[in-house]
């Protein structure tokens, strides 16, 4: 991937809709570039599969099953986060 040329070590990336498709591909590419990931999807099972791939790149990965159309779930998630350097808004 082209992101291998970019050093994202010590950066945290949040990817919504990361359980499948484009979101999953973005999360993996960011992990290849050295970023730590926070991945969100509605289904924990999908997140677990993606997290396993991300961990092969020695990146930390936090998963959060969340429906981004649910205000309460999103608010609870936001209150737990301290630092996000990169946002990929892919859900929906």
Outline where the language-model segments fall.
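The beta1-alpha1 cofactor-binding region of Rossmann-like NAD(H)/NADP(H)-dependent oxidoreductases
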Residues: 45, 64-76
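Aromatic pocket-lining residues of Rossmann-like dinucleotide-binding sites
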Residues: 30
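Flexible N-terminal pre-Rossmann segment of NAD(P)-dependent oxidoreductases
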Residues: 1-11
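Conserved glycine-rich cofactor-binding loop
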Residues: 12, 17-21
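Rossmann-fold scaffold of SDR-type NAD(P)-dependent oxidoreductases
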Residues: 16, 84-92
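Conserved glycine-rich Rossmann-like NAD(P)H-binding loop of the short-chain dehydrogenase/reductase
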Residues: 35-49
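Structural signature of beta-strand start/N-cap positions in the alpha/beta core
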Residues: 12, 36, 60-62, 83-85
């Amino acid at each position: 991937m082209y992101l291998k040329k970019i050093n994202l070590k010590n950066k945290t990336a949040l990817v919504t809709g990361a359980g499948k498709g484009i979101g999953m591909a973005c999360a993996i590419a960011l992990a290849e570039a050295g970023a730590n990931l926070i991945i969100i999807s509605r289904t924990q099972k999908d997140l677990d599969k993606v997290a396993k791939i991300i961990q092969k790149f020695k990146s930390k990965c936090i998963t959060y099953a969340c429906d981004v159309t649910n205000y309460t779930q999103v608010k609870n998630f936001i209150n737990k986060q301290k630092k996000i350097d990169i946002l990929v808004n892919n859900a929906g």
